[in-house]
């Protein structure tokens, strides 16, 4: 059965409506002002399962025979495909076994179980989990649903592009995140069928750039290691079946750092009131790397499944990167009242103290200075400089040190 054709994309678009929301584009005034383009967000984080993956999973399962479904389904996933398959299998009344890396966030594990799937935790990264899933499929006769290297799955994911064109026919650029490449395959292939002149840009984390490495080599390439906070895109080897489609239809690949993802998370929370997981943020971080102006750009936000502990850590790191939280070290005479004097100086500058570390061990005698490390909240870089200047004027010889929260 030939996939990734216009007929199949249209068929898939109708099929996935049974289980998905048609997520409406969100125009971003903030990102448009920041980049000089007309930026729209495709919020797949608003799907029932919290990510786009249910599109490919549901369409793939719809193409299976009844006998293939009843044997039971198995897949490997860092989280979102797991939930997609679990939910789709539940809709079809099939058994689902999901192999997930041991590093998978707890929220994704629990949500997958909530759809009735059996979860097996195995390996540190997706590739190890996938190898184990294939072993279980061989041993138990399960039907394997690949998370990205499957043309039917990619066709289902590509239905996102159909919705984008329906709502914004004159779209000029689409930014799509890349893990293994299934979403990029579907979106870029359909986008080029609908408008050969459109530019489709893939975005990967710099620490998991398997597709960029494969592009450069002209063949599927395996990375020795992956290291990124974007767990859903931490893939060593892209799909071999889909790679020719990506070579043909993807115009470029941009990589973004983990630091850029952290700042993008803060931007989405503060300016759009949206929770977007780290793996869904590359297309936001990549906007500043586009060397174009006044273009209609759509960034696909692929998911929003993020546990609260990770969320808290990312917010704090983002505030540090934006100079909204910082730590300063000052030396004080070791005598009563000095702490009150420093506090008064900070209060006058509206610095909000959130942590104090008073270290007497740096002094050599009772008359020498002791170190005080102060972690503060402020309004940004200018306010931070204002506080430092006030401390200098008061004679405290402040020194910026690493913030540990």
Where are these regions (language model features)?
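PLP-dependent amino-acid enzyme catalytic core
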Residues: 1-405
């Amino acid at each position: 059965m030939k996939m990734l054709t216009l007929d199949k994309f249209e068929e898939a678009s109708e099929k996935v409506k049974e289980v998905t929301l048609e997520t409406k584009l969100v125009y971003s005034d903030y990102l448009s002002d920041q980049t000089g383009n007309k930026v729209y967000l495709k919020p797949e984080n608003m799907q029932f399962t919290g990510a786009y993956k249910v599109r490919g999973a549901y369409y793939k399962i719809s193409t299976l025979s009844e006998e293939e479904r009843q044997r039971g389904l198995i897949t490997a996933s860092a989280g979102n495909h797991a939930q997609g398959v679990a939910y789709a299998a539940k809709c079809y009344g099939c058994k689902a076994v999901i192999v997930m890396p041991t590093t998978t966030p707890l929220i994704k594990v629990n949500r997958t179980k909530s759809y009735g799937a059996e979860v097996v935790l195995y390996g540190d990264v997706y590739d190890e989990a996938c190898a184990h899933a294939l072993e279980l499929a061989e041993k138990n006769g399960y039907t394997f649903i690949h998370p990205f290297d499957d043309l039917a799955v990619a066709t289902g994911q590509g239905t996102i592009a159909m919705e984008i064109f329906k709502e914004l026919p004159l779209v000029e650029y689409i930014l799509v995140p890349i893990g293994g490449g299934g979403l990029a395959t579907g979106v870029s292939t359909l986008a080029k069928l609908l408008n050969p002149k459109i530019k489709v840009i893939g975005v990967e984390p710099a620490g998991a750039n398997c597709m960029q490495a494969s592009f450069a080599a002209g063949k599927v390439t395996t990375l020795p290691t992956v290291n990124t906070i974007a767990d859903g895109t931490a893939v060593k080897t892209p799909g071999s079946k889909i790679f020719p489609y990506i070579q043909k239809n993807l115009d470029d690949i941009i990589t973004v750092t983990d630091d850029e993802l952290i700042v993008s998370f803060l931007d989405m929370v503060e300016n759009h009131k949206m929770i977007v997981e780290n793996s869904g943020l590359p297309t936001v971080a990549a906007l500043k790397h586009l060397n174009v102006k006044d273009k209609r750009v759509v960034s696909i936000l692929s998911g929003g499944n993020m546990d609260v502990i990770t969320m808290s850590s990312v917010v704090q790191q983002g505030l540090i990167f934006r100079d909204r939280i910082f730590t300063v070290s000052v030396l004080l005479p070791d005598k009563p009242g000095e702490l009150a004097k420093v506090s008064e100086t900070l209060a006058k500058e509206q610095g909000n103290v959130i942590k104090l570390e008073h270290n007497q061990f740096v002094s050599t005698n009772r008359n020498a200075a002791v170190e005080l490390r102060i972690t503060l909240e402020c309004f940004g870089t200018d306010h931070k400089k204002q506080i430092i200047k006030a401390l200098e004027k008061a004679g405290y010889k402040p020194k910026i040190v690493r913030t540990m929260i």
